[in-house]
Amino acid sequence: MLCCMRRTKQVEKNDEDQKIEQDGVKPEDKAHKAATKIQASFRGHITRKKLKDEKKGDAPAAEAEAKEKDDAPVADGVEKKEGDGSATTDAAPATSPKAEEPSKAGDAPSEEKKGEGDAAPSEEKAGSAETESAAKATTDNSPSSKAEDGPAKEEPKQADVPAAVTDAAATTPAAEDAAKAAQPPTETAESSQAEEEKEAVDEAKPKESARQDEGKEDPEADQEHA
């Protein structure tokens, strides 16, 4: 039995050796290779993160550099313009010294106007503040003042009523005369015709009364003769 066991063990070892020889790689080597692969992948992941961070950090720096480059030509242009403007201003006083005198004279009135304009709003504000304070004071004293003003207002009204009546009485005759004078000629003509008719009627009345008297006297005379 022991011999059989030894033989079987040898056969199993031989089978394992044959498999290793066929594969050409031992299990230890496989584990080592797997570990190296894992480490390599991990290292690659870390390096990628670093590269991304570096790119993100480089992007703002690149943008800042681009802005600086863009601003540089603009600043150069502004400096050139300022240089040209200063040159022209230097040339202007040299060529026209007389022009400065009117400009100075014009600046003086403008400064005076500015001073007046600044003083006017300040005065207006002070006046408005005073009016507001006065209005508040009057509103505070309004109940007592109203109570005092009540009888005082009634007395002037009563005094004004007879004066108005006397004025109306004095003006009525003058108003009638003015109305008569202002009447149109048609009304005056009608009034004159009415007066003439009245006079004719008045003249006719005594004649009729005389005729009636004569008629009465004739029958009486006839009766006497009879």
Curated annotation (Swiss-Prot):
InterPro entries: IQ_motif_EF-hand-BS, Neuromodulin, Neuromodulin_C, Neuromodulin_gap-junction_N, Neuromodulin_P_site, Neuromodulin_palmitoyl_site. Residues 85-97, 128-139, 159-192 have a biased composition (Low complexity). Residues 215-226 have a biased composition (Acidic residues). Induction: Up-regulated by kainic acid-induced seizures. Up-regulated after axotomy. The modification Phosphoserine is found at S41, S86, S96, S142, S144, S145, S191, S192. A lipid is attached at C3, C4 (S-palmitoyl cysteine). Expressed in hippocampal neurons, with highest levels of expression in the CA4 and CA3 neurons and lower levels in CA1 neurons. Expressed in the dorsal root ganglion. It comes from the Eukaryota. Its main location: membrane. The modification Phosphothreonine is found at T172. GO terms for biological process: astrocyte differentiation; axon choice point recognition; axon guidance; axon regeneration; cell fate commitment; nervous system development; radial glial cell differentiation; regulation of filopodium assembly. Residues 9-32, 51-84, 98-127, 146-158, 201-214 have a biased composition (Basic and acidic residues). Residues 31-60 form the IQ domain. Belongs to the neuromodulin family. Identified in a complex containing FGFR4, NCAM1, CDH2, PLCG1, FRS2, SRC, SHC1, GAP43 and CTTN. Interacts (via IQ domain) with calmodulin. Binds calmodulin with a greater affinity in the absence of Ca(2+) than in its presence. This is Neuromodulin. It comes from Rattus norvegicus (Rat). The gene is Gap43.
